[in-house]
Swiss-Prot record:
It holds the Pfam family Ribosomal_L25p. One of its GO terms (molecular function) is structural constituent of ribosome. This is one of the proteins that binds to the 5S RNA in the ribosome where it forms part of the central protuberance. SUPFAM superfamilies: Ribosomal protein L25-like. This is Large ribosomal subunit protein bL25. GO terms for biological process: translation.
């Protein structure tokens, strides 16, 4: 399984997301249950490197480590920029083990 490292974030919204993107990062969210979600930030370069090396990346389960807590997730949705090769946002869905 692939491993991705992320950092939890406390500031959410348009302004905070724009600041992240200026730092070459992007916001993401882990849907844990119907009630709770975890907001995280990921590195644009790290994610693109993983994406380019693994063709089955979108179909397989991924280990996502956020602040030393391990989640097994699947990608639910990716939002990309219209003409740049940048990711704007990703939704992850936690897989129950």
């Amino acid at each position: 399984m692939l491993t991705i490292y992320g950092i939890s974030r406390t500031k959410c919204g348009k302004k905070a997301s724009r600041r992240l993107r200026l730092q070459n990062k992007f916001p993401a969210i882990i849907h844990v249950s119907l009630i709770s979600n975890i907001s995280i930030e990921l590195s644009q370069n790290d994610f693109i490197n993983i994406e380019m090396k693994n063709s089955d990346f979108y179909k397989s389960e991924v280990i996502l480590i956020v602040d030393k807590v391990k989640y097994i997730v699947k990608i639910q949705e990716i939002q990309r920029h219209a003409f740049k090769s940048k990711i704007l946002h990703i939704d992850f869905l936690k897989v129950s083990v």
